[in-house]
């Protein structure tokens, strides 16, 4: 089973967005050397915690600084943009870096509604237009008769992916004949049948003749379970602050996270968000990921790892690669 990376360019307390981007670039090179298959970057707006607001620009830098790992958006939030312009961007990247570009698109705003309206040229949100936008984007990328034709035209088109965390996105991906990435790290309480909905509604397309799905999971891997749980506290507390808008949402130290006293509701939120995370030793994480892939019926696994310390983040991926024997080409 192939293993991939989603990186959100997290900003630690005491750090900066510039530092976060440099760490994302370094992590792409590091995970490529370890044998990971894809490296995707996310889109978020108006947040102190995550630096990536323009994945298409970061993708160009990542592709330039790596050699063969697939580079993608995880994802571009299509309702904010013109599908035609997104197609031009994706084709440009595919011309520069042939056979390496994944274009993951999603419906979620990636921000609050105030910022979502600011992203729109007329101050109106268009999330209800997403299915139509996806259909148009497919035609622009893959239909040679589409007019006006999208230029430049690469020798090999980018791979369009649907991203989502709900049955609606799974069904739409199936109907459009697209590969589907389910964000379990965003919606950990979703029924394991989510990918069945995708498979049942799948209509083969020239790009994707049979269903293909990946599952994105929060992962923290360390030499001991205790250390992995300690490292995971940073993400858990910072995400709680991010979700509630209370406190500094930048990635805090494990020591600060451990000192936070949670209410019963806050603890329940943290526990629920961590229910499908893979946190532990390499063997524990490997077993949890295989178990999740089997339960959901996923073809591929994508991992997202956030720690306060960048070296701990790299170490987590190194241990994971070793557990999956990525360097042997067998996983």
Region locations from a protein language model:
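Hydrophobic faces of well-ordered beta-strands that scaffold small-molecule active sites
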Residues: 3-7, 39-41, 71-73, 101-105, ...
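Acidic (Asp/Glu)-rich catalytic clusters
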Residues: 32, 59-67, 90, 94-101, ...
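Active-site mouth loops of central-metabolism enzymes
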Residues: 7-22, 76-83, 154-164, 273-282
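A conserved active-site cap/scaffold subdomain adjacent to cofactor or substrate pockets
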Residues: 170, 174-189, 195
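Flexible, glycine-rich active-site loops centered on histidine and acidic residues
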Residues: 2-17, 79-142, 180, 188
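N-terminal beta1-alpha1-beta2 module of alpha/beta enzyme domains
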Residues: 1-66
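An alpha-helical appendage that flanks or caps ligand/catalytic pockets
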Residues: 123-150, 190-298, 328-331
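Conserved, mostly hydrophobic/aromatic
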Residues: 3, 31, 35, 43, ...
């Amino acid at each position: 089973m192939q293993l991939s990376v989603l990186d959100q360019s997290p900003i630690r307390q005491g750090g900066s967005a510039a530092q976060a981007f440099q760490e994302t670039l370094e992590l792409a090179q590091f995970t490529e050397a370890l044998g990971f298959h894809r490296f995707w970057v996310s889109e978020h707006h108006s947040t102190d915690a995550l630096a990536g607001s323009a994945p298409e620009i970061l993708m160009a830098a990542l592709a330039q600084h790596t050699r063969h790992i697939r580079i993608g958006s995880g994802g571009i939030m299509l309702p904010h943009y013109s599908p035609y312009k997104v197609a031009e961007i994706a084709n440009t990247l595919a011309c520069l870096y042939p056979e390496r570009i994944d274009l993951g698109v999603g419906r979620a705003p990636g921000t609050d509604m105030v910022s979502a309206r600011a992203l729109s040229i007329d101050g109106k949100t268009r999330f209800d237009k997403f299915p139509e936008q996806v259909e148009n984007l497919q035609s622009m990328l893959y239909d040679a008769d589409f007019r006006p034709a999208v230029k430049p035209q690469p020798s090999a088109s980018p791979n369009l992916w649907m991203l989502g965390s709900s049955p609606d996105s799974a069904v739409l991906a199936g109907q459009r004949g697209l590969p589907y990435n389910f964000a379990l790290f965003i919606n950990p309480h979703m029924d394991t049948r989510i990918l069945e909905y995708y498979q049942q509604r799948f209509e083969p397309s020239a790009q994707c003749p049979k269903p293909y799905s990946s599952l994105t999971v929060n992962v923290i891997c360390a030499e001991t379970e205790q250390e992995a749980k300690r490292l995971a506290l940073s993400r858990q507390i910072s995400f709680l602050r991010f979700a509630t808008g209370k406190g500094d949402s930048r990635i805090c130290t494990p020591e600060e996270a451990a000192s936070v006293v949670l209410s019963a509701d806050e603890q329940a939120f943290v526990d629920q968000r961590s229910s499908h995370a893979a946190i532990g030793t390499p063997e524990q994480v490997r077993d949890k990921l295989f178990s999740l892939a089997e339960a959901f019926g996923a073809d591929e696994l994508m991992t997202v790892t956030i720690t306060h310390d960048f070296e701990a983040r790299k170490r987590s991926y190194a241990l994971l690669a070793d557990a999956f024997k990525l360097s042997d080409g067998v996983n």
